[in-house]
A protein has these predicted regions:
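Short coil-to-beta-strand
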Residues: 61-75, 108-117
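Periplasmic peptidoglycan-binding/anchoring modules of Gram-negative envelope and division proteins
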Residues: 81-123, 146, 150, 185, ...
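Periplasmic OmpA-like peptidoglycan-binding domain that tethers envelope proteins to the cell wall
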Residues: 119-194
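Envelope-exposed proteins and targeting segments
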Residues: 71-75, 80, 109-111, 155-157, ...
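N-terminal targeting leaders that direct proteins to extracytoplasmic destinations
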Residues: 1-71, 83, 90-94, 98
Length: 194
C-alpha cells in the first residue's frame, strides 16, 4: 500500500515537472524577434574563439591546476623560503614548461605568463617589526620561479610576477597548511615594460 502511494506521488511529481517544462518552452517560442540593432549588438558580444582573450582563457583552463611545488611530491615551499630545488623543478618543468611555451607562442606579445606567489596564513600579511610579512615571501617565491623558468627558455619579458600573500589559500585546506606556500600561473595582458 505504501509503495503504491509513493509510486503515485512520484508519477505526480514527474507529470508536474513536464508541465512546467512545456510552459517554459511556450514562453520562449512567443518571445519577439530581436531588431536588427539588437542582433548586431549580440553578435558583437559573442566571443571570437580566435581572439587573444579567448585563447588565453582556454590556456588558463589548462593552467588552473598548475602550481609549483606540485603539492604531491613536495607539499610547498619551506617556511619563509623561496627554495626552488633544481631536480624537483626540472621534473616539474618537463610536464609544465611545454604548455607555457605553447601558450606564449599562441598569444601576442601583449600577453605574459603571470606568476603569483602565495603563502600560508602564518605570520603578518605586511611587514611588522622584524617580520617581513607574507606579501614579501609570496613575491620572493614568484620571482624565484620566474628565474627558474628563464633558465628553461621562457623569455623574461613575457613573465610578470606578483605576490598574493595568504589571501588565496588552496580550496579545502586549512589556511595555515604548508601546501598554501606555492606559486600559480595564468596568462594575462601585461603592463607595458619600462
Amino acid at each position: 500500500m505504501v509503495k503504491k502511494i509513493l509510486n503515485l506521488i512520484l508519477l505526480g511529481a514527474i507529470a508536474f515537472s513536464f508541465t512546467l517544462c512545456s510552459s517554459a518552452e511556450k514562453k520562449e517560442e512567443s518571445a519577439p524577434e530581436p531588431s536588427g540593432q539588437e542582433q548586431s549588438a549580440a553578435a558583437n558580444r559573442s566571443v571570437d574563439v580566435n581572439s587573444p582573450q579567448a585563447i588565453a582563457d582556454s590556456l588558463n583552463d589548462k593552467l588552473k591546476d598548475f602550481r609549483y611545488p606540485d603539492g604531491l611530491t613536495r607539499p610547498g615551499f619551506s617556511y619563509k623560503k623561496a627554495d626552488v630545488n633544481a631536480g624537483d623543478f626540472s621534473e616539474w618543468s618537463k610536464v609544465n614548461a611545454p604548455v607555457i611555451k605553447e601558450g606564449l607562442g599562441k598569444l601576442p606579445d601583449s600577453y605574459a605568463l603571470e606568476i603569483t606567489g602565495h603563502t600560508d596564513a602564518i605570520g603578518p600579511e605586511q611587514a611588522e617589526g622584524d617580520k617581513k610579512g607574507n606579501i614579501f615571501y609570496s613575491e620572493l617565491r614568484a620571482n624565484a620561479v620566474k628565474q627558474a623558468l628563464i633558465k628553461q627558455g621562457i623569455p623574461a619579458n613575457r613573465i610578470t610576477t606578483k605576490g598574493a600573500g595568504s589571501s588565496e589559500p588552496v580550496s579545502g585546506l586549512d589556511a595555515k597548511d604548508a601546501k598554501n606556500r606555492r606559486v600559480t600561473f595564468r596568462f594575462a595582458t601585461s603592463a607595458p615594460q619600462q
